[in-house]
């Protein structure tokens, strides 16, 4: 299987992510680059919310998504009509140079990130050999088989009432509409999220923060591909597939929030449209992973202060001086709401057991240099970030932007270096106290800060006498061939040099580490070559209605996702009853123990996958009852590849 054969699926994935959102945004009056940047976020919201609404109105989950899309289109059109003026013409690029810069920035980012991700994935049907992937892959199969795609239904697969399912919904939609296998659909969605949604959002955020500057968006495109901590880290650690989608959507949501607050460099939307856009993009990100929405709320605290400060400086115009107090009361109320949510929108403490990994000094160094988790320094990125931060802090009107960056780096410093006390639990327990999750958030603001630093340096260089004189001569040539040639050469040089200086060991090491997680080898941590070959034979050897037992820690539960055969436990940490416990611990004793056969009859188990004792985390959790079934007379070997065995239970017939 090659990626060339999957081009139709990749095109289908692009259409699935873009078309519904484009339709809603168009009817809402959005045009220009924001239309493209906002479309995927809108689509994810439509699909994930539609999956929740569908069972409430008696529809299938895909039909529910269509219904929500139709309703959103109607609402968008109504909002656009109500404002009674076009909000889009001002969003059109001002000249051909900026249009070309946007196109080049997106194209360069897609190529730089896309080629890394394709190399990491290897084959289109590869899958991450990590703990969390057992749940993620099986959840997609669960949606496809049951139609239960709601965030309040998917978790039931593992005994939970709630699990954010937006990522799973999008993969299931791609698998269903694109007629693709689950691993291929997973890789297609992650590729689109990392190589398309993420850079689109980064460029959009830079546009909202700093305005329309060609060099700035070019730098933003290149820099979106310059951090090993996203998207590569989230495809390596966990694997945290939902976080990949959620964090990829965060720059768009942050840009929409800045616009809604009226803090954007060029506010061209009426307030109603601005706030509706923010409301529309937020559900998808939240239902992908709510911790990312918590990050958004925290990062917006400096923006709230900036807004209050600006409003308090406005002249009274005959009003009572009390009007200057209201903005600050609003800030206090906002902080109160965020503080409350911080205490309730989090996992239980028992699940937040990750420990600090370094000293505070080292954590600060990693945060500001973009070298989280010990990656090498990319000096160009560090220098641009340092200059950008210095420039932003030196200007009163942009200090709030620098503060947003410091919020995210501060979280990383806390989680990776602070003592395991109540303060650390309160601040970073939202992310399970897991350093990689917070390391992945830093690029959200590091990209615009570094891009701004690069643009300011270029602006400074352009003011040097010799350079300024040369630029003046070029401008005097108007739009002639020589002028166009110089502009193109300059743009190519900027992109080429910045790409060369940023695609260094930081990215390479992150990619190499992630690639190891996707390799099927004889000693792979989850599924070995032999085990995968045996899973591929199940279609011919196990009836469709059969139930298979196995130690989920060894990857046997992936028979559900990869072979479409029901397994006794669909998630490694799923809860199970006494009968299942009896099978796991005593099935081998079935010939002499009537209680075992009662458990077999009660659960309906027919087969056992024995993948040995090698577990994904290198620990032995027992499951001794599933071993040596043929030797004890409890079962017979139906098939075997290497040490991987498929048993049929025969003792209880």
Where do the model's predicted regions map?
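Membrane-embedded, hydrophobic transmembrane alpha-helices
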Residues: 1-96
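Extracytoplasmic
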Residues: 12-18, 470, 494-653
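Membrane-interface helix-loop junctions at the exits of transmembrane helices
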Residues: 46-49, 114-118, 146, 217-236, ...
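Membrane-helix boundary/interfacial segments in multi-pass membrane proteins
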Residues: 57-62, 124-129, 179, 232-245, ...
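Active-site lumenal/periplasmic loops and adjacent helix-entry segments of GT-C-fold
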Residues: 106-248, 265, 513-525
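Membrane-interface alpha helices of multi-pass inner-membrane proteins
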Residues: 268, 272-290
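Perimembrane helix-loop-helix junctions
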Residues: 296-331
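Hydrophobic, aromatic-rich transmembrane alpha-helices
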Residues: 305, 379-403
């Amino acid at each position: 299987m090659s990626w060339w054969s999957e081009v139709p699926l990749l095109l289908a994935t692009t259409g699935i992510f873009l078309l519904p959102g484009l339709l809603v945004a168009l009817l809402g009056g959005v045009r220009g680059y924001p239309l493209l940047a906002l479309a995927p976020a809108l689509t994810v919201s439509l699909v994930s919310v539609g999956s929740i609404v569908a069972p409430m109105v008696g529809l299938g989950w895909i039909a529910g998504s269509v219904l929500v899309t139709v309703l959103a289109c109607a609402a968008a059109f109504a909002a656009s009509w109500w404002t009674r003026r076009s909000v889009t013409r001002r969003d059109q690029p001002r000249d051909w140079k900026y249009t070309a810069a946007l196109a080049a920035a997106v194209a360069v980012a897609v190529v730089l990130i896309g080629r890394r991700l394709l190399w990491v994935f290897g084959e289109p049907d590869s899958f991450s050999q990590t703990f969390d992937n057992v749940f993620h892959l099986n959840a997609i199969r669960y949606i496809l088989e049951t139609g239960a795609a709601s965030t309040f239904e998917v978790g039931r697969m593992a005994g939970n009432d709630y699990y954010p399912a937006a990522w799973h919904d999008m993969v299931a939609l791609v698998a269903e509409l694109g007629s693709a296998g689950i691993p291929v659909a997973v890789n297609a969605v992650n590729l689109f999220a990392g190589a398309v949604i993420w850079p689109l959002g980064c460029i959009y955020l830079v546009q909202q923060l700093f305005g329309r500057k060609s060099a700035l968006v070019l730098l933003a495109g290149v820099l979106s591909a310059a951090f090993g901590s996203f998207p590569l880290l989230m495809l390596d650690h966990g694997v945290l597939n939902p976080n990949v989608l959620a964090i990829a959507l965060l720059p768009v949501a942050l840009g929409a929030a800045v616009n809604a607050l009226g803090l954007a460099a060029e506010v061209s939307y009426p307030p109603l449209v601005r706030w509706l856009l923010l409301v529309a993009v937020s559900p998808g990100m939240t239902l992908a992973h709510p911790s990312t929405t918590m990050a958004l709320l925290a990062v917006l605290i400096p923006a709230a202060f900036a807004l209050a400060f600006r409003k308090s400086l406005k002249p009274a115009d005959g009003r009572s001086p009390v009007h200057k107090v209201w903005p600050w009361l609003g800030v206090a109320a906002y902080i109160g709401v965020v503080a409350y949510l911080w205490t309730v929108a989090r996992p239980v403490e028992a699940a937040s057991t990750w420990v600090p990994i370094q000293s505070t000094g080292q954590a600060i160094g990693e945060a500001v240099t973009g070298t989280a988790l010990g990656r090498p320094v990319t000096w160009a990125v560090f220098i641009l970030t340092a200059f950008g931060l210095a420039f932003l802090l030196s200007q009163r009107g942009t200090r709030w932007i620098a503060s947003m960056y410091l919020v995210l780096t501060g979280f990383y410093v806390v989680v990776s270096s602070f003592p395991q006390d109540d303060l650390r639990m309160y601040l970073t327990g939202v992310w399970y106290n897991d350093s990689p999750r917070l390391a992945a958030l830093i690029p959200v603001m590091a990209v615009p800060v570094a891009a701004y630093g690069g643009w300011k340096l270029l602006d400074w260089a352009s003011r040097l006498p010799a350079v300024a004189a040369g630029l003046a001569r070029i401008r005097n040539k108007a739009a002639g061939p020589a002028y166009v040639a110089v502009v193109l050469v300059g743009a190519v040089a900027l992109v080429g040099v910045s790409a060369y200086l940023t695609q260094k060991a930081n990215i390479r090491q992150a990619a190499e580490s992630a690639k190891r997680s996707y390799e099927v080898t004889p000693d792979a941590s989850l599924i070995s070559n032999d085990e995968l070959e045996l899973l591929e034979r199940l279609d011919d050897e196990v009836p469709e209605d059969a139930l298979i037992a196995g130690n989920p820690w060894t990857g046997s539960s992936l028979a559900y996702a990869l072979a479409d055969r029901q397994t006794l436990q669909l998630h490694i940490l799923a809860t199970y009853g006494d009968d299942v416990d009896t099978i796991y611990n005593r099935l081998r004793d079935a010939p002499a123990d009537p209680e075992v056969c009662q458990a077999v009859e009660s659960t309906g188990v027919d087969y056992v996958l024995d993948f040995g004792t090698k577990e994904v985390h290198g620990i032995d959790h027992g499951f001794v009852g599933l071993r040596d079934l043929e030797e004890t007379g409890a079962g017979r070997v139906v098939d075997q590849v290497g040490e991987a065995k498929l048993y049929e239970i025969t003792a209880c017939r």
